[in-house]
């Protein structure tokens, strides 16, 4: 920086120090991402845009139906069925024992037998994934509605309920292990996604 010329009064030149005003860029950053940031009001009418019209009764009814626990559970059931079916067909495709007959180990299975086995495994996985998805989604929605908050505790509690219900078919110990395992998995997924 070039040397500053002395003032007319003969006093020493002012040095650039902490008394200097912050840069405009720093002020802008404080308002955009810093502690002076404020929530935006994104109403198009106040910004000079076209204001959005009020929602009709049909729109409100559709939104209410899509936010219901029954719709969320049905959506998770269908998604779980599709994902489980794809996963079952994939695992059957890489399994070397698909279509294998233990009575005649040297016989090569036909394409029809392999496809039948893949379909059976795909359907089995699809049903299991659909049930787990529907149970988890429904319990999480009900817990969220009951508690009135949307946080990580909802998924942990619903994971424990779902895992416990699935594991309880094999006994009390399996139910407790299923509860803990599914709750831990739900917490890990929720932590990763949020």
Swiss-Prot record:
Detail the disulphide connectivity of this chain as listed in its UniProt entry.
69-141, 160-179
* Annotated organism of origin: Homo sapiens
- What keywords are assigned to this protein? Disease variant, Disulfide bond, Membrane, Mitochondrion, Mitochondrion inner membrane, Primary mitochondrial disease, Protein transport, Translocation, Transmembrane, Transmembrane helix, Transport
Q: What is its main location?
A: mitochondrion
Query: What's the protein name?
Result: Mitochondrial import inner membrane translocase subunit Tim22
Associated disorder: Combined oxidative phosphorylation deficiency 43: An autosomal recessive mitochondrial disorder characterized by onset at birth, intrauterine growth retardation, hypotonia, myopathy, feeding difficulties associated with gastroesophageal reflux, and persistently elevated serum lactate and creatine kinase. Brain imaging shows delayed myelination. Muscle biopsy shows decreased activities of mitochondrial respiratory chain complexes I, III, and IV.
GO BP term, pick one:
protein insertion into mitochondrial inner membrane
Q: Name one GO cellular component term.
A: mitochondrion
| Organismal lineage | Eukaryota, Metazoa, Chordata, Craniata, Vertebrata
Tell me, in a sentence or two, what this protein's role is: Essential core component of the TIM22 complex, a complex that mediates the import and insertion of multi-pass transmembrane proteins into the mitochondrial inner membrane. In the TIM22 complex, it constitutes the voltage-activated and signal-gated channel. Forms a twin-pore translocase that uses the membrane potential as external driving force in 2 voltage-dependent steps.
**What does the sequence similarity comment in the record state about its family?**
Belongs to the Tim17/Tim22/Tim23 family.
